[in-house]
Structures are given as C-alpha cells and as structure tokens.
C-alpha cells in the first residue's frame, strides 16, 4: 500500500515563517518533516534525510534555516508546482509514500481565546500555540474556537485521485 500524507501549510514560525515572509510559496517545514519521516533506511536515503534536517549555522540571513526547506523551495521554483517538487524530493529520499500539501495556497490559523469575561481573536500558528500554552487552566480561560483561513482554500487537483483511494482500517 502507498502512504499519502496530506500535510498542513499553516506553519508561520522558524525557517518556514521566514520563507513565507520572503517568497510567495507554501511553508515547507511541515512538508519536509513528513518527507523525511517516510524516507527509506538505505545509506543514500538517510544521508539525504540528515541533509534535509541540517540547520545552517551562519552569521548571516541563512542562519538556522533548515537546508531541506531551501531545497524544497528551489524544487518548487524549478518545476513551478509544489506537488511535483515534493514528488521529486520524495524520489531523492526514496520515500515510502507521497507527501501532499493540504492546500495550494498558504493557510493561516486563527483562533478566539476567552480570558475571563472577554474574548480576543489571534492569528498565526505560532501565536495560537503560545496563547494556548500561556492560558491559566480554568473554566474562563480557554481556546474557544480555532479555524483555518482562507476558508475556501484551493486544493491541488491531485486530491481527486487520493480521495478516491482512501481506505479506513
């Protein structure tokens, strides 16, 4: 059986967040993590996996970027298609499955947080995660509602084939 991982494209922190600010592409970090988790155990695949996970250590703007994120963005620019680029990276890793973005446009996580008797709206995966962790547990402090924006994000056309082959075990 072929594994298909449909992965979020809402990451806005770290290397992915910086890439999102500088280029009009999907955030590659979560997609990279899914790709390396599906790689083969051969020396070739494990070497590529380690290279994909390598964080650059520089005194410049590339500091702490995951090299794999930059490679993925390069493939996207080369092929002008994120799914094709991910398939090529999967071939380099000899992946045991396919990684697909859940949307063909970058998504944003938004939430409504209840603090005491008032609510506030927050936006961004990193902000929502931090807000949830900072809330003092209690009946009046909670993450009241979370949503993804844009609400009607376009799915890549490949999903028709993938959706038809889904089996529940």
What would you call each of these model-derived segments?
Residues 2-5, 72-169:
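Conserved catalytic alpha/beta core of Sir2/sirtuin-type deacylases, generalized to analogous enzyme cores
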Residues 7-80, 91-93, 98:
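Glycine-rich nucleotide/cofactor/substrate-binding loop typically near the N-terminus or early
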